[in-house]
Amino acid sequence: MKTKILSLANEEVGEISLNKDIFAVEFIRDDIIKQVIDWQRAKAMSGNHKTKTVSEVSGTTKKPFKQKGTGNARQGSLRSVQMRGGGLAHGPIVRSHATQLPKKVRKLGLIHALSEKFAEGKLLVIDSLKLDKPKTSFLVNILNKFQGQSFFVIDGNEVDINFSLAAKNIYNTVIVPQIGANVYDIIRHEYVLLSQEAVNVLEERLR
């Protein structure tokens, strides 16, 4: 399956053959894409939320008032969950939110996400992702030629330092090496830009 290669000026400079089993899957499995995104987002959660239980709240252990004769409901501690300033019952604790997902499913998710973008016409192959200087304004002018609101840029094994520095201050533009290609960023950005090297490495990786 052939597609055109574009320059950073959004001009056609050649053709490249893409593996249809990676970039043009016939039936897009949105359920697999969602599974992988849920796995990614859960793994990214810090899990450092914490509330104090009765045993952790600072305060006296003295009984608030005598058991009988006051007309109040009996109380054993000022730190109980029903008391103002007391502990919290069944509150969040520090934990990992990460879940398990088979590598095969993760791989399928990436394939289906790439195929979905290609089917939408929003996966573009760029001949080179290298800049002469790390100028943000220069890169903004380049990206404006693609008329997109957000860009996920995937380079080969290494990212060009000038491109990376220029993209740092551009809203909704992310550049990663091929190892950083992930379903969440592919789906949440409008356009996916792949270098020729990224195409070759991804085809080898996802074969």
From Swiss-Prot:
The keyword Endoplasmic reticulum does not apply. Residues 50-76 are annotated as: Disordered. Keywords: Ribonucleoprotein, Ribosomal protein, RNA-binding, rRNA-binding. One of its GO terms (molecular function) is structural constituent of ribosome. GO terms for biological process: translation. One of its GO terms (cellular component) is ribosome. The keyword GTP-binding does not apply. HAMAP family: Ribosomal_uL4_B. Belongs to the universal ribosomal protein uL4 family. Part of the 50S ribosomal subunit. One of the primary rRNA binding proteins, this protein initially binds near the 5'-end of the 23S rRNA. It is important during the early stages of 50S assembly. It makes multiple contacts with different domains of the 23S rRNA in the assembled 50S subunit and ribosome. Forms part of the polypeptide exit tunnel. This is Large ribosomal subunit protein uL4. It comes from Rickettsia canadensis (strain McKiel). The gene is rplD.
